[in-house]
Amino acid sequence: MQGNEQQAYDRGITIFSPDGRLYQVEYAREAVKRGTASVGVRTEDGVVIAADRHARSPLIERDSIEKIHEIDSHVGVASAGHVADARQLIDVARRQSQVNRLRYDEPASVESLTKEITDYIQQYTQTGGARPFGVALLVAGIEDGEPRLFETDPSGTPYEWQAVAIGGSREDIQTFLEEEYAEGMDLEGGIELALRALASVNEDGLDATGVDIATIDVESEQFEKLAEDDIAERLEEFELGGEE
């Protein structure tokens, strides 16, 4: 009988269960967990986002797997979950960023951009004939000379973090970050921490072709993706690469 009651609340995303739950939003969070992990680290002089983009098949073209995106020159996003859902939210963020520049002749703040994204996500938790977004985002950037790092949730709730993981193995990676994160670390230290966090749940080590890293530093306020050679160099330096 209890299963039948739950099934009834499953069918409508706009209906709360008697104990105050929105089952479809909870299922969307499960979809995020099925995605490969992404990590964000805020440092004294910038912010780092890193993503595991290893191919699930050797026949997949690596370049077709993209988990880190530039939103504006000072903002980047990493995703975990349904790729198509992520693309739609990234388009929303890019449009809003362009609108802000055209309307106010200045870049959008990282916080306001995040809230625009989460407001859009939230609409899909109370609209009939739609479903929640099965994706979480890390929104990283520089605002008024300060690094900012936010997480979006399928419920439409934004959270600000010093260091955070989304996607598969989130709990294990988050525990690692909580143990290893230190206030005052520089951008290079943030890159190392992000790579070590991803490696902590990968027994075979990391491959430069299967990791994306981007930084936005306070001085230049410019989004920059690390080249594959730069990632390989750091993996070798930190002894995080897989066996040949």
From Swiss-Prot:
The keyword Cytoplasm applies. GO terms for biological process: proteasomal protein catabolic process; ubiquitin-dependent protein catabolic process. Coiled coil: none annotated. The keyword Cytoplasm applies. Keywords: Cytoplasm, Proteasome. GO terms for cellular component: cytoplasm; proteasome core complex, alpha-subunit complex. It is found in: Cytoplasm. Belongs to the peptidase T1A family. This is Proteasome subunit alpha 2.
